[in-house]
């Protein structure tokens, strides 16, 4: 199983796992960040929801050996297997014995593919951005998602005609959010514990870098340091990799939409809508002083 964060909100439904990482409310306006684990093959469906800010583990970044071993030990299957028919919905499920036989063959195929990928890696010395693609049908993906608007997602993905695996993901997300109590703050900082201190400027480095990794931990598996997180923050900033900056947000209110957030403005939005770096730095310092 892919490494993931767990806490009191962690909910498992089928092959989907949902955990609330940060949950913030101010003047009745709520913003929530979840860490998700789900089958890689439904990721394209999840990506169609444009009100979400997302970061995800990448097949181009994870070592071949690690991906192959995950498939060997715990290959992804299907939560529901239906008989073929016209249309997008399989109304009738296979009998349990046939379903078990199919899933056993499916997972065996994945394990055989993982062994083949390991062989190719040694034989040809091919990069992970190529070989990991062969493992995606049996792989999980870890995704960080932040949003203020969830109703349309739940309406579509909890509907009876949604693919069962994304139904289970939506159910896990809904249950995790229902089990979470938001903290009251003007700052939303995923992967930063604000229960014991007020937001600080260095929290921004931690939050952006950990959102980029989709983890509290660095690549070595230990909790990241301020030096590591600041270095990654600056590299992302200098190279224009702005997506991790979308998960950090401040309450701006006025019943306005700030990009895809209602009443909350993301750090990315701040950077992209201010004219020079000095103004951005001064503005961000003010945000943390006023929080």
Task: Briefly describe each language-model feature range.
Residues 1-291:
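A conserved ligand/cofactor-binding region detector
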């Amino acid at each position: 199983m892919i490494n993931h964060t767990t806490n009191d909100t962690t909910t498992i439904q089928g092959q989907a796992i949902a955990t609330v990482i940060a949950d913030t409310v101010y003047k009745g306006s709520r913003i929530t960040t979840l860490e998700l684990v789900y089958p890689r093959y439904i990721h394209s469906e999840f990506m169609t929801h444009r009100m979400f800010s997302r970061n995800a583990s990448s097949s181009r970044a994870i070592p071949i050996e690690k991906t192959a071993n995950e498939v060997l030990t715990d290959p992804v299957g299907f939560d529901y297997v239906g008989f073929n028919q016209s249309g997008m919905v399989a109304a009738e499920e296979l009998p349990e014995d046939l379903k078990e036989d199919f899933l056993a063959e499916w997972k065996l195929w994945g394990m055989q593919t993982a062994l083949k990928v390991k062989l190719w890696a040694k034989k040809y010395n091919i990069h992970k951005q190529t070989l990991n693609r062969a493992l995606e049908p049996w792989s999980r993906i870890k995704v960080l998602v932040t949003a203020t608007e969830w109703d349309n997602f739940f309406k579509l993905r909890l509907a009876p005609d949604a693919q069962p695996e994304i139904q289970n993901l939506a159910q896990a997300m809904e249950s995790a959010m229902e089990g979470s109590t938001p903290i009251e703050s003007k700052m939303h900082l995923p992967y930063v514990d604000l229960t014991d201190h007020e937001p600080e400027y260095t929290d921004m480095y931690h939050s952006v870098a950990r959102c980029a990794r989709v983890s509290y931990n660095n690549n070595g598996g230990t909790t990241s340091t301020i030096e590591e997180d600041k270095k990654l923050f600056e590299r992302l900033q200098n190279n224009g990799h702005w997506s991790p900056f979308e998960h950090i947000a401040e309450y701006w209110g006025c019943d306005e939409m700030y990009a895809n957030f209602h009443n909350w403005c993301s750090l990315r939005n701040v950077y992209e809508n201010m004219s020079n770096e000095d103004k951005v730095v001064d503005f961000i310092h003010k945000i943390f002083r006023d929080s």
